[in-house]
Regions:
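Short amphipathic alpha-helix that is part of the acyltransferase structural core
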Residues: 1-43, 50, 176-182
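Conserved acyl-donor/pantetheine-binding loop and adjacent beta-alpha core of acyl/acetyltransferases
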Residues: 37-41, 45, 50, 57-98, ...
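Conserved GNAT acetyl-CoA-binding A-motif
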Residues: 88-89, 115-134
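Charged/polar low-complexity intrinsically disordered segments, enriched in acidic residues
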Residues: 175-191, 196
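Conserved acetyl-CoA-binding loop-helix of GNAT-fold acetyltransferases
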Residues: 93-116, 139
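C-terminal "cap" of GNAT-fold acetyltransferases
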Residues: 157-180, 207-215
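Conserved active-site alpha-helix within GNAT-family acetyltransferase domains
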Residues: 129-154
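Active-site rim helix/loop that mediates acceptor-substrate recognition in acyltransferases
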Residues: 25-58, 63, 67-69, 187-193, ...
Length: 215
């Protein structure tokens, strides 16, 4: 479940450049980063963040794409009404080595860089809903929420039949929870559409339980 122990306390995150192309390809494989058609332009623009975690090989990477870009992910996000003005950025799902345990730190840093880089609180992150691997999906969602992200939406988008949409802008007020939902709950997309969000969670006998509150 949610990783609470760090096997290494070395955190060596940086903005990747063209000089890191081979290291990035070694991590990502032939398919590259999820939801990013071309690596080279993103490297040239300084849009990919990575963490070596004190190792010789790259351990984690994700792209921060401006919402005004014409790539499939920003375009799909704008069409869904998230960041329709084109301001801000969206973080692609990260690629991680199997034993990488610092995802929360990596997400926090990437989101802080996005806020500074694009001077906007319209910073989003997405995660494909993978119900074929529920435990892994629960763990990733818990990591995102633990990093300070808020689950705001769930809908079909480029790259996934259902995409979890997180905002780096937290809830202004904490109100009594409406209900608890699992990621596989068919009511979850409708509840989120009605103006509820999940910024915290618990664990039950069936896995991750999102705590939904009105925004």
């Amino acid at each position: 479940m949610l990783q609470t122990l760090e096997r290494t306390n070395i955190f060596d995150a940086r903005v990747l450049t063209a000089a890191h192309a081979d290291a990035l390809r070694a991590l990502a494989g032939p398919d590259g980063l999820p939801l990013l058609p071309c690596l080279h332009p993103a490297l040239e623009e300084g849009q990919i963040d990575g963490d070596y975690a004190g190792q010789d090989e790259l351990q984690a990477a994700a792209a921060l794409l401006p919402l005004y870009a014409e790539d499939p992910l920003p375009t799909s996000l704008r069409a869904a009404g998230y960041g329709a003005d084109g301001q801000g950025a969206v973080l692609t799902p990260p690629i991680l080595r199997e034993d990488y345990t610092q995802l929360r730190h990596f997400l926090r840093l990437a989101l802080r860089w996005a806020t500074e880089r694009y001077a906007s609180y319209h910073v989003w992150a997405v995660l494909p809903l993978d119900l074929e691997h529920p435990e892994a999906c629960d763990d990733l969602c818990a990591q995102y929420l633990s990093a300070g992200l808020t689950l705001r939406g769930m809908r079909p988008m480029a790259g996934a039949d259902q995409m979890l949409i997180f905002s780096a802008h937290g809830l202004v007020q904490w109100r009594d929870p409406l209900r608890r939902c699992h990621l596989a709950d068919p009511a979850l997309p409708r509840v989120l559409e009605r103006g509820y969000a999940a910024a915290d969670f618990g664990w039950g006998k069936n896995g991750l339980e999102l705590v939904l509150r009105p925004v």
